[in-house]
């Protein structure tokens, strides 16, 4: 048995089927995994649903608890005891996994001999999930130096022997954050922890109603669990210096991503604040003060208040931090926040620096193809600075080549009161061979020596072009296409520059006007103003100005008048190969439809007969296609 899946179930009749369906429909063969469902004395039809799946699928196991435990810990422990799999995966009854998750998880873990493997999480219906640790796949991450402490949920693949040999179970004496205690204990005993970030393994779903993560928990239970984690770190085999750093990492997580975040604001009464502060203080005093030097500055300031038993100061500070723009200024290239709550303490300037908390808030209002450029319009401000200070920023557009990391800079065409317009000239972006490839767009903002750069595009108005829309241009070396698009994972603006050899076109013709149209289907192509069709007749090259360009999301139509072409070819007495190109002979047009025949003109001409009598003969000028080529026939 490769994997045992553990699901604690309590009153999940509306949710459990979606979860189980994702588990029984895996690409991994069913004989390789088991699904252990532990019903915690449900009062709805959950148990009946579980038994239906058990009857239908041989790899579904159902355990019925006789007494409700009040939490998922005890049911999970029951399942661990009977699990037959080499690995154990914990799944909540209101979540589900990707169809390839088990096979990928197992193969990756076996290949890397992992004790624990974190599979990439995905939030559904607005459910927030940890992301920082899933930026790249890493078969061997460091517990202290990585971001994995920021995900302490049990939705991971654990080696069964790791849990059983080290007697790692979910604590049942606490009813809050028991999964964090379990996961930290497993982290501390694991010899190798891996991260697989190339597939959405586990889907956490935000449901209507109250989720355990946001339900009220008494402070003594919550901070009791936090003290258990600190105790586990202290008792671990880590070197003392690494223990201190790990506790600091945990404190960063705790204050920014737990119930303690802005705790004095969440508590509505003085009595609640005092009670929570008492247990918070007890927890913090269990952490050695040496850890304080390794936490983030805003966490260090909180610890200052807590270690000085200053609830009033912490309350004032957390409110001031919510309104940080009032207190933040730019000083010698640094963002400094001078909070009144800190005036009674002797604080170094270094602790007041908040550069790391700032980010550029941006919104793309419009992206527009315009002649030979792409117009990029939007707004951008510094999150921590007020409107008046933001008015002083200067902007630079930066294109960074994804492979070579080369950079190209453009000044804004206009900038006023945080609203910008950049004109990206395609010919400047694609001027040499080394420019081929993907260019990622950034905006860099600077104020009084302080600089910050951000990727742009993931917050925007609707993009009005199709994913195939491109600009077709040329330089002295080659013809190129420039296609703006938004990246897959982060949804930011990039431009893909590629060499372009030819474009397939269908033909249509208006006999009366002598208008010939080239129809490029499944493409929206933008061209420079005053574009032309180049015609190579074999003896000469003729330029036909583009009379009209009709653009639709999935079609481009170029129309030219061919009267001058007909005049030049009037002397042709036999079929001749001709070539069409756009703006340069390198940018060829090929015939998309084979054996197409278009009559360009019909004339009556005088011919001598064998009896030396003149005779009027009707002749046709035709444009033919064959094997992607064009032919002129008289």
Swiss-Prot record:
**Pathway in which this enzyme or protein is active:** Cell wall biogenesis; poly(ribitol phosphate) teichoic acid biosynthesis
| The protein's enzyme class | transferase
The record's note on what follows loss of this gene reads: Deletion of the gene abolishes all WTA glucose modifications.
Reactions it catalyzes: 4-O-[(D-ribitylphospho)(n)-D-ribitylphospho-(2R)-glycerylphospho]-N-acetyl-beta-D-mannosaminyl-(1->4)-N-acetyl-alpha-D-glucosaminyl di-trans,octa-cis-undecaprenyl diphosphate + n UDP-alpha-D-glucose = 4-O-[(2-beta-D-glucosyl-D-ribitylphospho)(n)-D-ribitylphospho-(2R)-glycerylphospho]-N-acetyl-beta-D-mannosaminyl-(1->4)-N-acetyl-alpha-D-glucosaminyl di-trans,octa-cis-undecaprenyl diphosphate + n UDP + n H(+)
An example GO BP is: cell wall organization
Keywords for this entry?
A: Cell wall biogenesis/degradation, Glycosyltransferase, Teichoic acid biosynthesis, Transferase
Q: What is its EC number?
A: 2.4.1.53
Does the UniProt entry include the keyword Nucleotide-binding? no
| Name of one Pfam family that matches | Glycos_transf_2
GO MF annotation, one = poly(ribitol-phosphate) beta-glucosyltransferase activity
InterPro entries in the record: Glyco_trans_2-like, Nucleotide-diphossugar_trans, TarS/TarP_linker, TarS_C1
- Give the similarity note: Belongs to the glycosyltransferase 2 family.
What biological function has been recorded for the protein in this entry? Attaches glucose residues to poly(RboP)-wall teichoic acids (WTAs).
Protein known as:
Poly(ribitol-phosphate) beta-glucosyltransferase
Q: Which organism is it from?
A: Bacillus spizizenii (strain ATCC 23059 / NRRL B-14472 / W23) (Bacillus subtilis subsp. spizizenii)
């Amino acid at each position: 048995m490769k994997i045992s899946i553990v699901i604690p179930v309590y009153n999940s009749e509306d949710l459990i089927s979606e979860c189980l369906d994702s588990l029984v429909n895996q690409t991994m063969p069913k004989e390789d995994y088991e699904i252990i469902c532990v019903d915690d004395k449900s009062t709805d039809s959950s148990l009946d649903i579980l038994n239906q799946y058990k009857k239908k699928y041989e790899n579904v196991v159902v355990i019925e608890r006789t007494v409700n435990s009040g939490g998922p810990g005890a049911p999970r422990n029951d399942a661990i005891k009977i699990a037959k799999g080499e690995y154990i995966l914990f799944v909540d009854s209101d979540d589900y996994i990707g169809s390839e998750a088990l096979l990928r998880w197992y193969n990756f873990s076996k290949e890397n001999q992992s004790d624990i493997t974190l599979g990439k999480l995905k939030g559904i219906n607005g459910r927030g999930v940890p992301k920082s640790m899933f930026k790249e796949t890493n078969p061997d991450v460091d517990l202290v130096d990585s971001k994995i402490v920021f995900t302490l949920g049990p939705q991971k693949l654990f080696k069964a022997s790791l849990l059983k040999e080290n007697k790692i179970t979910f604590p049942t004496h606490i009813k809050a954050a028991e999964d964090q205690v379990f996961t930290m204990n497993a982290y501390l005993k694991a010899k190798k922890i891996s991260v697989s970030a190339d597939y959405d393994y586990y889907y956490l779903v935000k449901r209507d109603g109250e989720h355990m993560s946001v339900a009220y928990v008494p402070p003594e239970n919550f901070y009791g669990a936090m003290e258990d984690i600190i105790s586990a770190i202290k008792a671990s085999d880590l070197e003392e210096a690494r223990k201190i750093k790990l506790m600091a990492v945990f404190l960063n997580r705790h204050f920014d991503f737990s119930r303690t975040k802005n705790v004095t604001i969440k508590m509505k009464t003085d009595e609640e604040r005092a009670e929570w502060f008492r247990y918070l203080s007890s927890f913090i005093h269990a952490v050695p003060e040496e850890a304080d030097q390794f936490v983030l500055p805003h966490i260090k300031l909180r610890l200052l208040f807590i270690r000085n038993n200053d609830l009033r100061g912490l309350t004032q500070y957390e409110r001031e931090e919510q309104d940080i723009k009032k207190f933040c200024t730019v000083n010698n290239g640094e963002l400094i926040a001078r909070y009144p709550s800190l005036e009674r303490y002797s604080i170094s300037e270094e602790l007041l620096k908040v550069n790391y908390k700032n980010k550029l808030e941006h919104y793309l209002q419009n992206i527009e193809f315009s002649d030979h450029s792409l117009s990029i319009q939007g707004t951008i401000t510094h999150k921590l600075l007020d409107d008046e200070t933001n008015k002083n920023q200067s902007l630079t557009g930066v294109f960074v080549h994804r492979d070579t990391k080369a950079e190209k800079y453009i000044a804004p065409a206009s900038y006023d009161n945080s609203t910008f317009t950049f004109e990206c000239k395609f010919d400047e972006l694609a001027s040499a061979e080394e420019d081929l490839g993907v260019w990622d767009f950034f905006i860099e903002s600077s104020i009084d020596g302080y600089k910050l750069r951000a990727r742009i595009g993931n917050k925007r108005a609707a993009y009005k072009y199709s994913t195939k829309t491109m600009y077709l241009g040329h330089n002295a070396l080659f013809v190129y296409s420039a296609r703006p698009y938004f990246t897959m994972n982060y949804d930011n603006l990039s431009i893909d520059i590629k060499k372009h050899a030819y474009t397939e076109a269908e033909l249509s013709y208006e006999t009366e006007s002598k208008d010939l149209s080239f129809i490029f289907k499944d493409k929206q192509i933008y061209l420079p103003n005053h574009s032309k069709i180049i015609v190579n007749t074999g003896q000469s090259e003729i330029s036909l100005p583009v009379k009209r360009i009709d653009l639709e999301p999935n079609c481009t139509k170029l129309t030219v008048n061919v009267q001058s072409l007909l005049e030049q070819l009037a002397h042709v007495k036999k079929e001749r190969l001709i070539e069409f190109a756009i703006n340069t002979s390198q940018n060829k047009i090929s015939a998309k439809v084979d054996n197409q025949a278009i009559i360009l003109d019909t004339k009556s001409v005088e011919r001598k007969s064998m009896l030396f009598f003149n005779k009027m003969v009707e002749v046709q000028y035709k444009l033919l296609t064959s094997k992607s080529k064009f032919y002129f026939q008289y």
